[in-house]
Design a protein with these regions (language model features):
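OB-fold ssDNA-binding interfaces and closely related basic DNA-contact patches used
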Residues: 1-98
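A structural detector for beta-sheet-dominated domains
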Residues: 36-38, 102, 151
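Structured, beta-strand-rich domain cores
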Residues: 61-143
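Residues in flexible loops and secondary-structure boundaries
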Residues: 20, 43-45, 107-109, 156-164
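Compact mixed alphabeta submodule
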Residues: 115-186
Length: 186
């Protein structure tokens, strides 16, 4: 049994896969992505449950049989429910399980044919792919929970961008000429 799994197809949201980002001021910047896993993907959910159970067992074994902390926070949430900090998840999360995964190290990024993915424009919030993630239990500084680290991302195909969208070179080809627009107000 392993704490590492490869997901089935998921939609990516909040992609920070080329440049690490700190979630709050003073925090360590991390590479991260939120995975939107369809509730219909029973196979991935079975793998997640088994990996979470294994992470709990490993925590107890590596801590001399220490009991599992009670009231563990989880990185896995129901997209049809409420966010952990209150309020509803966005429309894109409906019908999905939502899991945010991160890493201090840059994850392996590949195309469906396993060639390296090097263009940041190709991995955006809204595209689809698979992820290799590794579950672990944490109990530090009063925070207790089960989370998952991000090891790799495989982009499968494009999807409708979430949020601000994707800008391409052709978006600038609108015929605008600078020489006649020196004074736009006057």
């Amino acid at each position: 049994m392993s704490t590492q799994i490869t997901t089935g197809k998921a939609r990516f949201s909040y992609c920070n896969l080329f440049t690490p980002r700190a979630v709050q001021e003073g925090a360590t910047p991390k590479y991260s992505v939120t995975l939107l896993i369809p509730k219909s993907d029973k196979a991935t959910m079975q793998k997640i449950k088994a990996a979470m159970d294994e992470a709990k067992q490993k925590f107890m074994a590596s801590n001399s049989g220490k009991k599992l902390p009670t009231n563990l926070k989880s990185t896995l949430h129901d997209g049809d429910g409420e966010r952990p900090n209150g309020g509803e998840f966005g429309e894109e999360c409906k019908g999905c399980y939502v899991i945010t995964v991160s890493s201090n190290n840059k994850p392996v990024l590949v195309h469906a044919d396993k060639t390296p993915l090097t263009d940041p424009q190709e991995l955006y919030s809204g595209c689809y792919g698979r992820a290799i993630i590794n579950f672990y239990v944490y109990d530090t500084q009063g925070n207790k929970g089960i989370s998952a680290g991000l090891n790799g991302i495989m982009k499968l195909y494009d999807g409708e961008p979430l949020g601000g969208g994707v800008v391409t070179d052709s978006d600038w080809d609108d015929g605008w000429e600078d020489e006649d627009n020196d004074d736009l107000l006057g």
